[in-house]
Amino acid sequence: MMVKIKNIIILFCIFGLLSNVSSLSSSSSSSQSSDNNGNLSPIQDYDLEFLSKHLTTKTPYWILTKNGDSNSQGDGSSGNSNSNSNSNSNSNSNSDSSNEPPEQCKLISIDFIARHGSRMPVLNSIEKLKEMTTSILEYKEQVNQGFNWIFNYSVPYPSDIAGNLILQGQYEHYNISKRLLKKYPLFFEPMKYKPQSYSITSTAISRTGISASAFSYGLLQGTGSLGVDGFQPVFIETASLDQDILLRFFATCNQYVDQLKNGTLINKDEQTKWNQMVFPNISNEISERLGLSDIWLPTSNVISDIFEACAYEISINNISDHWCSLLSKQNILDWEYSQDLSNYWLKSYGHEINYQIATPLLNDILSGFDIYINNNNNGSSSSSSSSSSNNGDNSGSNGSSGSGSSTSTSSNDNGSTNNNDNKVEPTSILRFGHAETIIPFISLLGLYKDEQKLFANSSTEQIENRKFRTSVVSPYASNIAMFLFDCGSAADGFKILVQHNELPVLVPGCDEIYCDYQQFKSIFKQGIDNFKWNSYCNINDDDSGSSGGDSGNGNGNDSHSKKSSYFLAIFIPITFLVGGTIGGIFTYFSYEKIMQVKNRKKLTQYGNDEFISSPKSKSFSFKPTKFDSRSPLIQ
């Protein structure tokens, strides 16, 4: 009996020991899981998902879904929120039955505009990061031990690859294209690649060109004939940096550039006012966390650099326990609003010029759709009513090649006109630019527009519930896609769907997400008709140089250039002839005058010895002095 009791006690002890081991293992696993969540410090009252969704234009690409940050709603029209996904794996399409096109509608053309993917810091940012820690180095002995890594910190971003696209940025575009292909297989699969059916353009910057390559590779993977994997090479067209009015309008509109540098038209003060309000408190908090209260306070520039260093560490290496560990949740939200104020007033709704300069891009998109519709006017009874607000003028003639040129080329390479029996193939227009491309273009469409303008002294409620957030509007690889559908009947005609970051959005002025194409065009018709690139963007220029077809599409520029070419072709030869004639006459009379002076001197010095008198004439002739090639008369 005693033996049995002893055995039972031993079993209970063993069971208890195993339970403790299991508990310790579970605790260890939980602790490890917490550590894997980014080694967040106690002051980091947020998780990595929050952090990676509030880095303004340094934010990794979002996958837009219905579950996520309630403060990140778009323009208020979709009613959907967002959740983050930075995975390099292929993600499922965010389809929803309510967002499916009407059953009778067929996708016939796509125009896709995207920002480049995640990148390295640009050179200027790298230089600032190198100087960031210099003011704190002398306080090494006083800094809290948890931050000793600061004194061994070196900027991990090589200057020779500054601004380059990183692998994550390539995957962002690769995965977007895969989801697009999965969403519309019937549109893409029958369409073999050729430059006439795929117009792919980027700015003349490597990160946008490589983004275009990554997107194209995902979209066309395995469809080519090159190599064992069926690689399909593509043609990517670029325009020179100083002439690209479609994707770099922010740099080629002289009026806008001048206002940014010197003008008072664009408000630059709101961000400064906000920083003056919140940065002193952030400075005190950072100093306290470092253990340097009353010893060292980071300046406004150092604070900005710390935020930027945090953003790059998250977006490039997913590191949160270095510079981000100095920042609380409220610090990050305050910095995010600081950046939003800058982008709002310099690139968005702060002033009309910020987004009106994106008009040529919108006009080029609609012109391309119109050309496609008019060349396929057998497909819908409503197509005969479709025409561009500028009769299909193609803005691609100045700057990046546009959709109009792409679609017309597919059937007009020989210069002949299309007839109704020869339909143009479906066309994909893919464009790759920058945050400065996306933000103004989204603003031109009226998306993410707050009822009241954003100011440094806006109410807390307005700041917290604002629609305009660059973390949502323009993260890395942000995109706007326009889908043209042929719905096949006079009642429905053609419809257009606009998506921002793969989520359908309701454009203000449209009755529904699948907006009637004519209605969509009418919303922007006046703005397109009234916008003249030359008169709007060229400083001290008037409308006379851009009259005619300059409806925001660059044709006025082209027309002006042609007129200048004709003028110069006539003026230069005439000037040369007149100038040469006058020069010859001047040289001749100068020569005669010099000879006369020389002869007078000789006559005075030698009498008439140099002259030969003619017995039959009272006039005199003389032996001319040979011209010296070194004479000052011959230059």
From Swiss-Prot:
- EC number(s) on file: 3.1.3.62, 3.1.3.80
Q: What biological processes does GO assign it?
A: glucose catabolic process; inositol trisphosphate metabolic process; response to lithium ion
User: What would you give as a GO molecular function for this chain, any one?
Assistant: inositol-hexakisphosphate phosphatase activity
**Where is composition skewed (Low complexity) in this entry?**
67-99, 380-421, 614-624
Task: Name the encoding gene, please.
Answer: mipp1
Cellular location(s): Membrane
Q: Which protein are we looking at?
A: Multiple inositol polyphosphate phosphatase 1
Entry function: Probable multiple inositol polyphosphate phosphatase that hydrolyzes 1D-myo-inositol 1,3,4,5,6-pentakisphosphate (InsP5[2OH]) and 1D-myo-inositol hexakisphosphate (InsP6) to a range of less phosphorylated inositol phosphates. This regulates the availability of these various small molecule second messengers and metal chelators which control many aspects of cell physiology. May have a dual substrate specificity, and function as a 2,3-bisphosphoglycerate 3-phosphatase hydrolyzing 2,3-bisphosphoglycerate to 2-phosphoglycerate.
SUPFAM superfamilies registered for this protein in UniProt: Phosphoglycerate mutase-like
- Give the Cytoplasmic membrane side ranges: 587-635
Q: PANTHER family given for it?
A: MULTIPLE INOSITOL POLYPHOSPHATE PHOSPHATASE 1, MULTIPLE INOSITOL POLYPHOSPHATE PHOSPHATASE-RELATED
Q: Give the residue range of the signal peptide.
A: 1-23
Topological domain, Extracellular: which ranges?
24-565
Naming one, the record's GO cellular component terms include: membrane
Task: Give the highest taxon in the source lineage.
Answer: Eukaryota
Principal location listed in the UniProt entry: membrane
From the record, give the transmembrane residue ranges.
566-586
Q: Where is this region: Disordered?
A: 66-102, 380-425, 614-635
Q: Does the keyword Transmembrane apply?
A: yes
**Pfam families attached to this UniProt entry:** His_Phos_2 (PF00328)
Keywords, sorted A to Z: Hydrolase, Membrane, Signal, Transmembrane, Transmembrane helix
Species of provenance: Dictyostelium discoideum (Social amoeba)
The way this protein sits in the membrane is described as:
Single-pass type I membrane protein
State the disulfide connectivity. Answer: none
What family name appears in the similarity comment?
Belongs to the histidine acid phosphatase family. MINPP1 subfamily.
Q: What reaction gets catalysed by this protein?
A: 1D-myo-inositol hexakisphosphate + H2O = 1D-myo-inositol 1,2,4,5,6-pentakisphosphate + phosphate; 1D-myo-inositol 1,2,4,5,6-pentakisphosphate + H2O = 1D-myo-inositol 1,2,5,6-tetrakisphosphate + phosphate; 1D-myo-inositol 1,2,5,6-tetrakisphosphate + H2O = 1D-myo-inositol 1,2,6-trisphosphate + phosphate; 1D-myo-inositol 1,2,6-trisphosphate + H2O = 1D-myo-inositol 1,2-bisphosphate + phosphate
PROSITE patterns of this UniProt entry?
Answer: HIS_ACID_PHOSPHAT_1
